[in-house]
Amino acid sequence: MNTKSKAQQVFGEHAPQYASSSVHVRDDSLDIIEKFVDGTKYNIAMDIGTGAGFTALSLSKFSTLVIASDPTSQMLQQAYNTYSNNNIKHISIVQNIAEQIPIKDGIIDLITCRKAGHHFSNFKSYLEESHRILRDNGTLVIADSVSPEDLEAEKWFNDIELQRDLSHIYNRTPTTIKNLLHNAGFQLQCEKTTRIYLQFSSWVARTGVNPQHINSLKQQFTEASANIKKHFQIQNSDNDISFSWPCLVVKCAKITKTTR
């Protein structure tokens, strides 16, 4: 099974859970995105890896037209329901993977991608595609969970996420992401870090973790080293486990060939 079909399987089977997930509906990362794009009216905006469509819904306040893109048809149906329920008519839906975007060169004013980049099989190709379809000096805003700049924490984070979600590819460090952006032709304009606050029970339920595997995952949280518990704020909470992932939000501008 390839990575694309893994993502479609995981998110296709559990699209309703993501549509009702509080950390996907709205959290600090979406608030930061709105602050980053507020004050500008965009002609065409595109949200890549839109999932249930909440970021694209937010962009509709700042854009004449929004394109919501995702590889999973069930997720796009949830997005369509979200827009219909809010009587939003200027959002178009497109099904595609992030590494192959069916859009002409240089016509998009704003691209966003929230909590999806760690699922992309080729993050570099996604950035290259974003650069291709953005107009000169167009804006790219990415928000995603990131690994700490600590090898033990980076390994633990990615191992635990892959056990919970077979479509997981990699949570990169902030340094890695910013280097990839620079190499793809983007200039960092501003950045902000925040946290994604989670509860273990809803975290495993969202991807339908096999009940027989839940105890193994829980044990890896409770028996994690002090370093891991500090990085991810792991603690017992009302018969559950609370924790948080670091999240990086960056706003970048496409650098034109004449200025690179």
Residue ranges and their predicted role:
Residues 1-40, 54-58, 74-78, 82, 141-163, ...:
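Conserved class I S-adenosyl-L-methionine
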Residues 46-100:
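Class I SAM-dependent methyltransferase SAM/SAH-binding core
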Residues 52, 123, 189-260:
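Conserved Class I S-adenosyl-L-methionine
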Residues 112:
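A conserved beta-strand element that flanks and buttresses the S-adenosyl-L-methionine
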Residues 115-116:
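Short catalytic micro-motifs in class I SAM-dependent methyltransferases
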Residues 124-136:
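A short glycine-rich, Lys/Arg-flanked "PGG" loop and its adjoining helix->strand segment in the class I
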Residues 170-185:
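Short alpha-helix
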